[in-house]
UniProtKB/Swiss-Prot annotation:
The record marks 102 as: Transition state stabilizer. Binds 1 Mg(2+) ion per subunit. It catalyses: Endonucleolytic cleavage at a junction such as a reciprocal single-stranded crossover between two homologous DNA duplexes (Holliday junction). NCBIfam families: PRK02234.1-1, PRK02234.1-5, recU. This is Holliday junction resolvase RecU. It holds the Pfam family RecU. SUPFAM superfamilies: Restriction endonuclease-like.
Length: 202
């Protein structure tokens, strides 16, 4: 359950609180994974009526089912299948949003083995339909998070079909850093609003 501050508009903000608001927050220090931080961010967006974005369920291959009762089935063996698309999708201000989230402890690059061909194909299809598609890349050791447009990911992937790692320099050059916070933890919609809907990114 995510707790949100009550009546944020009515609260008086002091200079110190303003500084704290803009201070980067490391969600890992609070025992939260990158995925959990994104889920909490999406819950915040939903609660505030900002956007409706959800994590897609991981597909499961059912292998064995027992029927202890005629009217009740029990799955006793199943396996997670490889996801065929991306992690998250939804809608923001009438725009379709679709993205993947990846995390690494490496300091200089993001392993491309984390991305699969069918995911790249899915992202290309989303872009063809004018959807907003991207990846959120978190470098845990550096405590840095980046929004990388899907086109930049696809362009790099096509160089070697995902056999190498994507240098951090490439990500910094072609993406945008997401400043982590408290509410929401991973404010990626700020990038979309400023760089895409605002018309800065071409």
């Amino acid at each position: 359950m995510v707790n949100y501050p009550h009546n944020p508009i009515c609260q008086k903000v002091t200079p110190l609180q303003k500084q704290q608001k803009h201070r980067q927050v490391d969600f890992a220090n609070r025992g939260m994974s990158f995925e959990a931080a994104i889920n909490a961010t999406n819950a915040y967006y939903l609660a505030k009526g900002i956007a409706v974005i959800h994590k897609k369920p991981t597909p499961i291959q059912i292998v064995k089912v027992d029927y202890p009762r005629r009217s009740r089935a029990k799955i006793v063996e199943a396996y997670f299948k490889q996801a065929s698309t991306t992690d998250y999708s939804g809608i923001y201000k009438g725009h379709y949003i679709d993205f993947e989230a990846k995390e690494t402890r490496q300091k200089t690059a993001m392993p491309m083995k984390n991305f699969h061909a069918h995911q790249i194909e899915h992202m290309a299809a989303v872009l063809k339909q004018k959807g907003i598609c991207f990846v959120l890349l978190h470098f845990a050791t550096l405590k840095e998070t980046y929004y990388l447009p899907a086109k930049a990911l696809i362009d790099f992937y096509q160089i070697d079909r995902g056999n190498k790692s994507m240098p951090l320099d490439y990500i910094r050059k072609n993406g945008f850093e997401v400043k982590l916070g408290a509410f929401p933890q991973v404010p990626y919609l700020d990038i979309i609003e400023q760089k895409f809907l605002g018309g800065d990114y071409n």
